[in-house]
Amino acid sequence: MPLYEGGPLTQFTAFSAGVIPNDVFGVAINWFVNRTPLVSRLPKLPAGSPQFLVTNDNYRPRSNPMNNGGALSSAAASVTVADATIFDVGDVIQIDQEYMLVTGTPDSGTTTGNVLNITRGYAGTTAATHNDLLPVYLVSNSRTGAEVNVTSVSRIPQAVTQYCQTVQHAYQVGGALQADANYVTGFATPLDRDRMLAMQHVMDDFESAIYYGKGVPISQASSRPLMKGISNLIQTNNVTSPTNAAAYKPSDLVRDTLQASFNGGGNPTVLLVSTDFLSGFAVWGHAAMRLQAGSNVFGTPIDLFEAPFLSGISIIPAPLLRPGTVICLSDPEVRIRLKRPMIDKPRGSRGDAFEGDIITEGAIDLDNEAHHAWVTGVTAFAAA
């Protein structure tokens, strides 16, 4: 049944990825599955320290600009690029219509700086003069079939430090209020009202930090660590002033999210959208269609949509996202790391009052930031 699909589509993965939530967290994950979709639906894995590293793999780019200091003449046997470390001996490169063979690189010890030794007019093309700053395209590497002692191309992953954040909200209720029975709404909650309010405040704060946290480390005893949110973890495809922001069209959405994620090497599966995008889909003539994603244990349907022009991409409305915001995720690379799953810590009775705290500690873990996209600043929508 749909409840057991993978990805941040339902709350099932929150229960089945390494951390078994205790009772109060299980209640929160289910009760707030639509209000706080990432906290509720993403897989949960343990974190054993106040901070951890988020890994961004660093593969060879397919192009690099010339940095020759002038035009490359048709007779030149070397070229300077912006970053020669991405190239290897035997690489076939292309500038304009000319193909060239790389015969020497800094890593092989045959050149220095960012200089490449090249064979001109390779593969039947003609050597020509090329203007500086043109892109140097990496076509492919080609070997003789009997080479030895090949020097590897080292691409060291980028590691970003993420900080576990503690969120804590108290509930305090007097005995007289606890004894009142005529103010409760007909929509019952799993726990008493004050405890549920504290639980919602914790879930709201944690979800909002996942979006907008800036990152504050532990530097002294009085530090208040803050996780880095998705808006700060995503650097490559982070759009804050989108083209056509006041007349945003479906093509703009695809360009800023899906296309950007694919270009970065990702496999986008989910769009998390602010609620105004639901109106945007209607303006575009592609109203979001609800999918049957099951319901939580309390019988509430789980919000999950698709739009006709985004077939196969799940759309999840996120009430706590600011207007004009959309997040595109390659969901297998996103998870919640918990140092302390949500706990209910009663302080007990004090006089004629009952008190306690709802506490959780953790952070978002998002691998390979170039595989995802963040867009904000959309102010109005226009038909395609």
What is each model feature region?
Residues P2-D23, P46-T55, L304-E306, S314, ...:
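Hydrophobic, glycine-enriched assembly/anchoring segments
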Residues Y4-T129, A382:
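Autoprocessing Asn-cyclization modules and mimics
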Residues G7-S16, Y99, S108-G175:
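Cys-His-centered catalytic/binding microenvironment captured across papain-like cysteine peptidases
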Residues P50-N64, N244-M342:
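Extended oligomerization regions of viral-like shell subunits
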Residues T55, A75, T80-A82, D96, ...:
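A structural detector for beta-sheet-dominated domains
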Residues P106, Y122, T275-F277, P319, ...:
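Short, flexible loop/turn elements at secondary-structure junctions
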Residues S154-L253:
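Alpha-helical scaffold segments that mediate packing/assembly in large oligomeric complexes
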